[in-house]
């Protein structure tokens, strides 16, 4: 009993240390975003000045605008493509389905730098295609589609195939069957995939760095360029806001997943 007690204490300490290692830098960053001092090691009082300066910086506002536009377009298009791909994969035989899923896995586990360089090489084949908004959005779509597939496909696999057959037996067209039977059932997966795509696009730096053009900057690229001149308190404020947005999106995904699980039972 004593050994079990010590073992539990040690395991709890280990877990606490792991979480401190993961989240302590983030906590320090958030605290420093409200610090009057320009130097993180000294606390000189609470302030919102860095946030006020952040929103007065036109270059940051422009980067925010670019990021939101790219993330919105990429997530919507990737969700549409990923949903259709999921339906196609789900209708395949097990052999071909396994091949397609493995191909999707490869694109997910590939290092971002490999994807970024390969996309840059691919875009360079087309002389009419200049690096800019189009290439950036295409790159983000490529990044996000596999995640949508793996968000939607489980919902399709849970779907009772007899429902579609019954609807068509009762006179429903394939289009009506999709919109009235299939779509409502897989909607939680579609929404989760879209939110995940938006988050991935919002957070991406490496792929954006390789596929964006001159004069176009996303928030992640802007943060990188700002750090070259030293760690400004505005960077702390900007990354804190980005972190807040990502946390909110992940909470929404978790709530929707929990509701979906409750509805199943």
Question: Whereabouts are the PLM-identified features?
Answer:
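Short hydrophobic faces within alpha-helices
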Residues: 64, 89, 106, 162-170, ...
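Membrane-interfacial helix termini and adjacent extracytoplasmic/periplasmic loops
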Residues: 39-41, 48, 113-143, 175, ...
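Short membrane-interfacial helix/loop motifs at transmembrane-helix boundaries
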Residues: 24-58, 209-214, 265
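Interhelical loop and adjacent transmembrane-helix boundary motif
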Residues: 3-8, 50-59, 202-259
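Hydrophobic alpha-helical transmembrane segments of multipass integral membrane proteins
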Residues: 61, 65, 69-81, 85, ...
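C-terminal transmembrane helix and the adjacent membrane-cytosol boundary/short C-terminal tail
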Residues: 2-14, 24, 153-168, 174-183, ...
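Transmembrane-helix boundary motif in ABC transporter permease subunits
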Residues: 1-8, 72-104, 117, 121-124, ...
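Membrane-cytosol interface at the C-terminal ends of specific transmembrane alpha-helices
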Residues: 133-169, 176-182, 192-197, 205
């Amino acid at each position: 009993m004593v050994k079990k007690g010590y073992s539990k204490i040690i395991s709890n300490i280990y877990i606490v240390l792991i979480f401190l290692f993961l989240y302590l830098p983030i906590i320090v960053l958030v605290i420093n975003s409200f610090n009057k001092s320009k130097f993180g090691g000294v606390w000189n009082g609470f302030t919102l000045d860095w946030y006020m300066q952040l929103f007065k910086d036109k270059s940051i506002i422009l980067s925010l605008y670019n990021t939101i536009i790219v993330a919105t377009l990429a997530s919507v298009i990737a969700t549409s493509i990923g949903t259709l791909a999921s339906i196609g994969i789900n209708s395949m035989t097990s052999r071909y389905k396994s091949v397609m899923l493995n191909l999707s896995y490869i694109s997910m586990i590939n290092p971002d730098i490999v994807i970024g360089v390969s996309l840059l090489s691919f875009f360079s084949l087309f002389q009419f295609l200049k690096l800019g908004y189009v290439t950036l959005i295409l790159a983000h779509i490529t990044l996000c589609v596999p995640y949508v597939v793996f968000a939607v496909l489980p919902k399709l696999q849970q779907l009772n195939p007899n429902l579609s057959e019954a609807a068509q037996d009762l006179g429903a067209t394939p289009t009506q069957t999709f919109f009235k039977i299939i779509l409502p059932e897989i909607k939680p997966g579609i929404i989760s995939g879209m939110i995940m795509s938006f988050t991935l696009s919002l957070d991406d730096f490496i792929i954006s760095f390789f596929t964006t053009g001159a004069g176009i900057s996303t928030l992640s690229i802007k943060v990188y360029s700002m750090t070259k001149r030293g760690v400004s308190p505005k960077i702390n404020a900007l990354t804190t806001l980005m972190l807040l947005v990502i946390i909110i999106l992940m909470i929404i995904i978790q709530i929707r997943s929990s509701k979906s699980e409750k509805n199943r039972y």
